[in-house]
C-alpha cells in the first residue's frame, strides 16, 4: 500500500502588533480600551514596548497647554523610538499643530473617533484575521487592573466654564442609552471586576440630552436618568463609585442609595472655587451657602459620605480676599479629599480675556497655603476612622503585605489602606479590617 504525504500545514504570518501611549483622564483611557478591543478582535496583538510594535498609537490630552506640551513630547518620543506613529485624542482636534511639530506622524484623528483610528491602523499595518486566534473577551480589553474598570456613560458637556475647552473638543453632551451602559457593566462584573468607576464630563447630567428616554434591558424598561442608572448599577454586586458629578439638586436623590450600601458613599465634585465673584467669572454655580447646606444635608443622610473635589487658585482676577474666602469655605465644608491646580491659560478658553492675571509666584504661594490648610482638615477626618472596621479592596500584594483601598479611596488619586504582613491575600480580594493608624491621606489596618 502506497503512502501519501500529508499536506504541509499552512503557516500564518505573524500577527501585526500595535503599541499605545494613553495620556490624560480616565475617559481617555476608556477610549484607548475601546480602540484596542476593536483592533484585537481583528487579529492585532498588543505590544508593551516601542520596539515590538509595528505601529504606535498616541492618545493625547489637550485640556491644558501643559497637557498639550506633554502630548507633543510623547508623540516625539514615540517617533524617536518607533517611527510609525498615529495620533488620536483631544489634541487631535489641532492636527495642524501636531503636523507642524511632528511632520513624520502618519495620521491624526480627533477624540472618540474610533472608526477613523482603526482605519488609519489598517492603512499602515493591514489586519490578519483568523477567527480561531482573534478571540476577545466579551468585556473587551482594558488598561486597568483586572479588579476595577472605568464605565463611561456619556461624551461631551453642556456646561461652558470659561477655563475649559472640552465642549469645543468633545462637543455637547451625548449620553449612552441606559441598556448599553448596563450591558457593559454586567459584562465587566461577570469578568471579575469588583469596582465600577462611573465617568463622563458631567455624570449627574446623564440622560438630559436623551430626555431620559427608556430603552429595554433584559426585557424591561430602563431610563437614561442619573438616579435610575445608579439604582441599576447598585444591584450588580460591585462597588459603584461616582466621578465628575456637578452639584445639581437632584444629586440629593442618590444619597439614600449610598446610605443603603448600594452605591459607594463617595462623590467626586469639582467645585473649583468658593468665592461667588470667582465662580461667576468661571461660569460655575456661585451659591456657596446653598452648596454648604447641600453638603450638610448629604452627610446627615449618609454620615460615611466622602467628598473629593478639585480647586483652581490664581484664576484671573482672584484677590487675596477671594482666596481667603475659599480657605474659610473649606474649613466649613470639610472636604475629605482635595486636588488643587494653579490656573494656567488654555488656548481658546474664554478666561484668557478676563483681566487681572495673577503672578506665577502668587499662584504658587496660594497653592502651598491651600494644600497646607487642607492637610489639617484631611488629617482630622482620617483620624476619626481609627478603631473602625472597614471593607478593603486589595490592589497589590508583595512580601511586606497587602495594599488596598476603602470606600473613601479612588484608585490613582486618593489614599491607600495598608495591611502589613497580609501576604496570603490576592488582588481583587475584599476583606474586613480595623483601622489602627492614619495620616492625612492613608490608613493602616489589621485584618478582622
Curated annotation (Swiss-Prot):
Residues 143-381 form the Radical SAM core domain. One of its GO terms (cellular component) is cytosol. Its EC number is 2.8.4.4. It is found in: Cytoplasm. It is an enzyme of class 2 (transferase). [4Fe-4S] cluster 1 binds at residues 25, 61, 90. Residues 16-126 form the MTTase N-terminal domain. GO terms for molecular function: 4 iron, 4 sulfur cluster binding; aspartic acid methylthiotransferase activity; metal ion binding; protein methylthiotransferase activity. GO terms for biological process: tRNA modification. Binds 2 [4Fe-4S] clusters. One cluster is coordinated with 3 cysteines and an exchangeable S-adenosyl-L-methionine. Its cofactor is [4Fe-4S] cluster. It catalyses: L-aspartate(89)-[ribosomal protein uS12]-hydrogen + (sulfur carrier)-SH + AH2 + 2 S-adenosyl-L-methionine = 3-methylsulfanyl-L-aspartate(89)-[ribosomal protein uS12]-hydrogen + (sulfur carrier)-H + 5'-deoxyadenosine + L-methionine + A + S-adenosyl-L-homocysteine + 2 H(+). [4Fe-4S] cluster 2 binds at residues 157, 161, 164. Keywords: 4Fe-4S, Cytoplasm, Iron, Iron-sulfur, Metal-binding, S-adenosyl-L-methionine, Transferase. Belongs to the methylthiotransferase family. RimO subfamily. PANTHER family: RIBOSOMAL PROTEIN S12 METHYLTHIOTRANSFERASE RIMO (PTHR43837), RIBOSOMAL PROTEIN US12 METHYLTHIOTRANSFERASE RIMO (PTHR43837:SF1). Catalyzes the methylthiolation of an aspartic acid residue of ribosomal protein uS12. This is Ribosomal protein uS12 methylthiotransferase RimO.
Amino acid at each position: 500500500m502506497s503512502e501519501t504525504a500529508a499536506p504541509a500545514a499552512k503557516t500564518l504570518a505573524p500577527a501585526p502588533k500595535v503599541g499605545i501611549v494613553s495620556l490624560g483622564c480616565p475617559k481617555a483611557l476608556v477610549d484607548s480600551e475601546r480602540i484596542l478591543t476593536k483592533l484585537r478582535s481583528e487579529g492585532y496583538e498588543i505590544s508593551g514596548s516601542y520596539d515590538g510594535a509595528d505601529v504606535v498609537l498616541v492618545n493625547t490630552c489637550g485640556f491644558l497647554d501643559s497637557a498639550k506640551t506633554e502630548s507633543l513630547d510623547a508623540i516625539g518620543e514615540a517617533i524617536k523610538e518607533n517611527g510609525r506613529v498615529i495620533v488620536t485624542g483631544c489634541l487631535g482636534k489641532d492636527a495642524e499643530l501636531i503636523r507642524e511639530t511632528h511632520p513624520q506622524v502618519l495620521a491624526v484623528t480627533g477624540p472618540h473617533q474610533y472608526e477613523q483610528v482603526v482605519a488609519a491602523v489598517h492603512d499602515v499595518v493591514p489586519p490578519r484575521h483568523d477567527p480561531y486566534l482573534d478571540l476577545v473577551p466579551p468585556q473587551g480589553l482594558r488598561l486597568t487592573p483586572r479588579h476595577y474598570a472605568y464605565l463611561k456613560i456619556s461624551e461631551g458637556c453642556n456646561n461652558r466654564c470659561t477655563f475649559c475647552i472640552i465642549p469645543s473638543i468633545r462637543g455637547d453632551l451625548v449620553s449612552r442609552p441606559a441598556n448599553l451602559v448596563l450591558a457593559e457593566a454586567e459584562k465587566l462584573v461577570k469578568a471579575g471586576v469588583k469596582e465600577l468607576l462611573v465617568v463622563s464630563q458631567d455624570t449627574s447630567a446623564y440622560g438630559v440630552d436623551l430626555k431620559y428616554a427608556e430603552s429595554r434591558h433584559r426585557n424591561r424598561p430602563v431610563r437614561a436618568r442619573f438616579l435610575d442608572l445608579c439604582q441599576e448599577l447598585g444591584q450588580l454586586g460591585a462597588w459603584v463609585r461616582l466621578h465628575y458629578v456637578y452639584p445639581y439638586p437632584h444629586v440629593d436623590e442618590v444619597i439614600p442609595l449610598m446610605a443603603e450600601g448600594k452605591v459607594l458613599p463617595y462623590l467626586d465634585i469639582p467645585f473649583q472655587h468658593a468665592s461667588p465673584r470667582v465662580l461667576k467669572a468661571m461660569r460655575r454655580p456661585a451659591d456657596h451657602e446653598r452648596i454648604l447646606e447641600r453638603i450638610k444635608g448629604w452627610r446627615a443622610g449618609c454620615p460615611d459620605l466622602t467628598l473629593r473635589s478639585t480647586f483652581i487658585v490664581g484664576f484671573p482676577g482672584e484677590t487675596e480676599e477671594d482666596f481667603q474666602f475659599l480657605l474659610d469655605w473649606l474649613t466649613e465644608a470639610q472636604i475629605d479629599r482635595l486636588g488643587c491646580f494653579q490656573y494656567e491659560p488654555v488656548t481658546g478658553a474664554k478666561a484668557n480675556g478676563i483681566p487681572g492675571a495673577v503672578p506665577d509666584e502668587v499662584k504658587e504661594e496660594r497653592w502651598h497655603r491651600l494644600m497646607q490648610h487642607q492637610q489639617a482638615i484631611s488629617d482630622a477626618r482620617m483620624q476619626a476612622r481609627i478603631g473602625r472596621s472597614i471593607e478593603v479592596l486589595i490592589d497589590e500584594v508583595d512580601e511586606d503585605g497587602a495594599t488596598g483601598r476603602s470606600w473613601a479611596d479612588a484608585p490613582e488619586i486618593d489614599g491607600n489602606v495598608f495591611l502589613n504582613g497580609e501576604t496570603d491575600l490576592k488582588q481583587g480580594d475584599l476583606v474586613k479590617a480595623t483601622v489602627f493608624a492614619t495620616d492625612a491621606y492613608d490608613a493602616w489596618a489589621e485584618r478582622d
